[in-house]
Every structure is written in C-alpha cells, then in structure tokens.
Amino acid sequence: MMRRVAQMRAEKMIGMLFGMRKIISSVVAGLLCFGASISVPASAQADDLQAMLKKAGQENAGVDLMAGRTYVVAETLNVPTGVRYIRGHGAHLDVRTKGTSSELASAFALAKETSGIELSDFTLNMKNSSFSSGISGDHISNVTIRNVTMNDVNFRGVSILADHGDVSNVTVDRSTITMANENDGVVPIFVSTYRVKDDYTGKGAEVWERYVATGKTADPMFKNTDIKITDNTIDGGYYGIEFSGVTSSHITGNTIRNNTRNISMQDRSSNNTVENNQLRDSISSSVHIAYGSEHNDVKGNNIVTRRAYGQGILQAYQGSKNNTFSGNSVTTRDKHPSWLLYVGPDSGGTTFTGNTVDGTANRAFVGVESVWDGDSSLSHLNDAKDNPHSYMVQGESKKPSGETVRYAGGNGPLENITITGNTFTPRNKTLPVVYVGAEVSKAQNGRQEVRGDIKGINVSGNTVKGVKGNDYSELLVTHEGSLDKLGPATISFTDKSVVAQ
C-alpha cells in the first residue's frame, strides 16, 4: 500500500515538472521571438553586416557585434525598421564610405519612420570616409545613441533630420566625437528641419539673403522636437552642435571645444534649454541664437576661450526674441571678440542676468544695436571714419559670400532689453562697458525705411570690477543715428545706471 502511494506521488511530481517545462519553454520561445539577438562574426564585412541588419529587422531583433573586433564598412549600412538595437561591445568599425555633396553616405543610416532603437558601445573610425555621417536618421523617433565614439570625422558625426517627416525623442548621450577639421559645414551633431520652399531656396546663403531682404525666416515643413544632447565630448567642427528648426529640446552637460561656434540655434529653433555645458575655445560665439529663434534658455554654462575674435560670445540677433542668458560664466583671454554679450536687430525681450563675465573685447564689453546700417552708424560722429563700438564699425560689413554691404538687417524698434545683476570684469581701458546704438535705414531695393528706436532698455544693478580709465573708458556709451530727414532714432531707458546703486 505504501509503495503504491509513493508511486502515485512520484508520477504527480513528474507531471508537474513536465508542465513547468512546457510553460518555461513557451515563455523563452516568446522572448526569443520578440527580442532575439543576431551575433555578427568578426570576419563579417559590409555585405554580411547588411544581411544581418535586414534579418534583424524582419525578426524584430537586435544585432550584437563581437567585442574587440574591427569591421570594415565600405558602403552605407542601411538599418531597417524593426531592428531593436545595435550593440558594439567595444567593437571598431573602419568606415570607408564615399559620399558626395549631393548624395551623402553614412556608416549607419536609419530607415525613415524608425522608432525604438538603441545604438551603443562601438567606435567608428572615419578617417577614410568622405561626405559621410557616422549615424544618420530622417523622420525618426524614440532613438538613443549612447557611448559611441567617432574619430577623425570629416563631415558629420550624428545627423538627425526632419526632411521627410517629423522627428521626436532622439537622445545622443555619453558619446565622444572628434572632428578632422573645423571647416564650414563640418558638424559633429547636426539637427536640421526642412524648410518650405520660396524664392530664396537654393540660393547661396539663403537664410541671410531672405532675412536681409524681407525680414522673414522660412517656415519649417516638419517638427523636430524633444532632442536630448547630454554628457557628450565634442572636439572640432565648424559648429559643435547645430540646431536648425529644432524646438523644445535640451543641450546639457556636454564638453564642446575648438569650434567656430560651440553651439548654434538658428532658423526658428525655439523653446530650447542649453544648460551646464563646458564650452571651450570658440573662434566666434560660444552660444549663437539667430533667425527667428525665440524663448531659448541659456543658463549655467562655463565658457572659456583664448581664440575668439569674431562676434559676441553669448548673442541673439536677426528676429530672435525673448531669449534669456543667465548664470553663465564667460572668460576670454589672449584674442578678443567684438563683444562678450551682444543683442542685435529685431531681438527684443533679450535678457542677460546673473552672468559672470571677464575679459577683453574689441568694440564694447556689452553691445546692443537695433539696425545694422553703416551710414546711420557713422552719423553724428564729427566726421569720424568709423564707429568703433558698432557691428558696422566702418560703415559696412560682409555678407556670407564676402561681398561688402552697408545694410545687413533690422526692421524696426528693439524693445525690452534687460542687462541686470551681472558681474563684469572689463579689461580694455579704451572701450565702454555697455554700448547702445539705435539706428535708422533708408528705403531701398523694395524695402521700406526703418526707424530702429530702442525702447524700455534696463541696464542696472550690475557689478563692474576695475577702475575707469584703467580697465574701461565709460560705463555707458549711446548712439542715436539719423539719415537726411529720417530719424534720429531714440533710446528710452527704464534704468541706465549700469551698476548697483
């Protein structure tokens, strides 16, 4: 009897084990079906990699490269939708793609409408590539690029494009991008939005030409939003990070060095935050905001440059309203920019507050101008041949093509500029701490006359370190320009005490 009971118990246990085995097998099979991994052998080259990416897309799977191995990439690797991840495990890719100016190449090109992929933990060596991006994607969402290294990039590192549809929720995090040079058009992280075509589309320097002729910027065709550029190290390139038509995005915690401009936000790049970045050795601006880019918040950045001889280190101009620069530390040494802080035409509502700024400028420590008109800027100067504080210092400036012009922007009054609560350490005894220039411009080339009154400007409560005559010439210099029967333009301050009383 006891033997029979024991036998029954054993049979019951065996049945339970078989049942559990079936359940476990079913779960594992389901997991493998959704998130299978395809391992790429060390011997694989471009054709093999492409085939495995295609298979991963079909199976909704990820791709694992082999740790410590090097793969040769001679042609663009097209990553289809459905690929869940590409994990490098420390692998290197020798990128030899050959694009052209009209047909760009990439090491990895994400398919349109890609969503839900992570690319991580590999190195792209791009010395032998041309007109290529390391990673590119157009009309993508929910994409993460993390812990990727790109070396000797001679065109683009990461390209995030809204050329054929909206872009949202793309992250570039803890990656290192080193460029081969700082040439115009060479950009480590390039985020751009296609613009509606008009009469200026396709012309050289179309953004500049459009704005100067019409005072307008082109409409973006798609949305490019929720981009997060965080904790990366970037060295070289014309811009370190370029936003064109990008909104509601973040550039945070990056170290960016050796660029013409460290960060550029143009073409209606609005409602973005630039925070806690280490910006080093720009030739021109460290943070540049232009062409209809509004409501951006630039705060808590640490900026040091020994190479700057271009425009303002922190600046907004050409229709870029209501931008705030606060709590930034700015230091210039050796070479000198035109200004350290600057606001230009059609950019009312600009605020500089709580910044600590130390260095030497070539025109003024802080500059505010309503209209870039050379003839107006030279008016009422007792026959002087230049206005040393103005953008149009000798009555002219150069357009991007290099051609000299005497008008370069400004379509009306400049209102509600705030420069308060900053700490300034100027180091040029021949220049003022603050220059404010209100200018006019005659009607010409189909453009109406412009009167650039400056209204409601507040320059007060700042701390200015140094001694007048030794470290700066005056606290405040103003200029109110006029031409024939036009003007003078006027300046109305709510407070012009400059320093804390």
What role is predicted for each listed range?
Residues 34-42:
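C-terminal segment of classical bacterial N-terminal signal peptides
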Residues 111-259:
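Right-handed parallel beta-helix
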Residues 42-64, 76-78:
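Acidic Gly/Asp/Thr-rich repetitive segments characteristic of extracellular carbohydrate-active
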Residues 6, 11-28:
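Bacterial N-terminal signal peptides that target proteins for export
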Residues 64, 72, 78, 87, ...:
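Extracellular beta-strand solenoid repeats
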Residues 73-76, 95-101, 127-134, 153-160, ...:
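Short glycine/acidic-rich loop motifs that flank beta-strands on beta-rich extracellular proteins
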Residues 50, 54, 70-87, 94-120, ...:
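Extracellular beta-strand-rich solenoid/capping regions of secreted or surface-exposed proteins
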